Design a protein with these regions (language model features):
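Short alpha-helical segments used as structural interaction elements across diverse proteins
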Residues: 10-11, 23
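Sec-dependent signal peptide recognition
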Residues: 12-18
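The feature marks long extracellular or luminal low-complexity segments
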Residues: 2-9, 27-295
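Hydrophobic h-region of N-terminal signal peptides that target proteins for export
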Residues: 19-28
């Protein structure tokens, strides 16, 4: 069971007192409060009040309670530090009786962005593969719920930059876009007003395309080497990508997996009589070679 801290206890005690004050019989006419309906977060303002003499003023907000003695002049001054958290507030004034009124504090102008880009790596030319999501906050880190324009600027390693503008929905803006045709670093920047945040996604080569192997025999051994392995956009597959060489001869079927090094894959196989040799990379199959003792 979670223990209640001293600060939490004091807050609960104050709220209980306020609740009790609000239900006390109003045997005398209390001063009237007339706060504005909405206030921008962090903006000082005044509440017109009708009454005379002295009273106790309470301001109950989403994350704190303010209490102070006031003189019932023409208006009550509310400090900017008292209304930094967005949400509903209750103003309570107690002299011979208690009266209350509510008002709403709304987020100020956009001042911070929380920006997420997914994934960190993506194959080139893949539809709807990049997700960008931005959360818009004001300077007090209230989520700005009113619609705000957010520009997502995409700058690929090669090719022209482009952008998309969307409006936030309850503080959130997002897009889904295709990866570009060329491998390399792609920067995505979210911009709202004078605020911007940038993230990077690394585009890598897609599946192999036009995979071909050539063979050089030497006795009962054959050396197999691929042409430079690239995807359909001409991007080289990264070193370490596995290429599979398969041989079928009188001794049976065998497969050797070899990583790409410096753009090509290379291996040696022993051959017994007639043989059929093929190459594949992932789900992509390349050419086949019929080996009859000479190629």
């Amino acid at each position: 069971m979670k223990r209640t801290s001293r600060s939490d206890f004091e807050l609960y005690k104050r709220l209980a007192i306020l609740a009790l004050l609000c239900v006390l019989p109003r045997w005398a006419r209390a001063a009237k409060l007339n706060p504005p309906a909405t206030v921008e977060a962090g903006q000082a303002f005044s509440i017109p009040v009708q009454g005379s003499g002295e009273a106790t003023f309470y301001l109950v907000g989403p994350d704190h309670v303010v209490k102070r003695a006031v003189k019932l002049t023409s208006e009550l001054q509310i400090q900017s530090s008292d209304v930094r958290a967005a949400g509903l507030y209750q103003a309570i004034l107690c002299d011979s009786g208690c009266t209350s009124a509510t008002f709403e504090v709304k987020a100020a102008q956009p001042a911070h962005l929380s920006f997420f880009l997914h994934p960190s790596r993506v194959p080139v030319s893949t539809p709807n593969s990049i997700d960008a999501t931005a959360f818009v906050f004001d300077q007090y880190f209230n989520l700005v719920l009113s619609p705000s324009a957010v520009d997502f600027r995409i700058t690929p390693a090669s090719g022209a930059a482009f952008s998309r503008r969307v409006s936030t929905l309850r503080g959130v803006a997002w897009i889904r876009t295709d990866s570009t045709p060329h491998e390399g670093r792609v920067q995505v920047t979210a911009v709202s007003g004078n605020v911007e945040e940038a993230r990077v996604v690394q585009q890598v080569a897609a599946e192999a395309c036009g995979l071909r192997v050539k063979a050089v025999p030497s006795g009962n051994m054959v050396t197999l080497e691929t042409d430079p392995v690239r995807d359909c956009s001409g991007n080289a597959l990264p070193d370490g990508t596995v290429v599979s060489f398969t041989k079928v001869d009188s001794a049976g079927k065998s497969t050797v997996d070899t990583p790409i090094k410096k753009g090509v894959a290379r291996t040696q196989l022993s051959v017994h009589g007639r043989a059929q040799i093929s190459v594949a990379c992932g789900v992509v199959e390349g050419n086949e070679i019929a080996f009859n003792g000479k190629l």
